Amino acid sequence: SVIKVPLKKLKSIRQAMKEKGLLEEFLKTHKYDPAQRYRIGDISVALEPMAYLEAAYFGEISIGTPPQNFLVL
């Protein structure tokens, strides 16, 4: 079965950080390395915070009993 999740458009993380004057410092300290997710021999999961800076659509889902709500990109 397919469940449709209504999406909400919000400001992107990049735009919100820019408005608060935080973006420039963040970009200096968090370099984006697209090759990082392809490392071999590293069993840890590579988090790519840069990939989510442009995300502007969110949906709310509920999991469990009693339901717990989560926002997902």
From Swiss-Prot:
Molecular function per GO: aspartic-type endopeptidase activity
Principal subcellular localization: secreted
- Domain named Peptidase A1: residues: 57-73
The entry's localization annotation reads: Secreted
A GO cellular component entry from the record:
extracellular region
One GO BP annotation is:
proteolysis
Q: Which residues form the propeptide?
A: 1-43
Residues of the signal peptide: none
In UniProt terms, what function does this protein have?
A: Hydrolyzes a variety of proteins.
> Can you say what this protein is called?
Gastricsin
Naturally occurring in which organism (per UniProt) = Sus scrofa
What is the phylogenetic placement of the source species in the record?
Eukaryota, Metazoa, Chordata, Craniata, Vertebrata
